Amino acid sequence: MATLFDQAKLMARELQDSDEFKQLSTALAKVRADQEANSAFHDFQVAQKEIQELQSKGEEPKPEQIQRWQTTAQKAQQLKPIKDLSVVEQNLNNMLGEVNEIITAPLNELYLNN
């Protein structure tokens, strides 16, 4: 019988073969091919990472950091390649959420039944 880790590796390969993953790959390639979208996407990622790193240390971001993040997010969301990427990311996240519910169902049952 395969181990849990073997099954996880199989699931990772299945994820890569899924339509959602392929759509994400295509959408991301379109963002990278569009200079304006790629630049805006990069700026957003940098601003978001900066805030996440502060929060992971238990620190609050400064108002100007939050403003920069919001500004870059608004700029990015106005660009079609990034809008399209966001939709595809949401679809993939929905699928992963459903998979997570299936995987963790025994844990939920354990806690609810005891």
UniProtKB/Swiss-Prot annotation:
It comes from Oenococcus oeni (strain ATCC BAA-331 / PSU-1). Transmembrane segments: none annotated. InterPro entries: Com_YlbF (IPR010368), YheA/YmcA-like_dom_sf (IPR023378). Belongs to the UPF0342 family. The lineage of its organism: Bacteria, Bacillati, Bacillota, Bacilli, Lactobacillales. This is UPF0342 protein OEOE_0901.
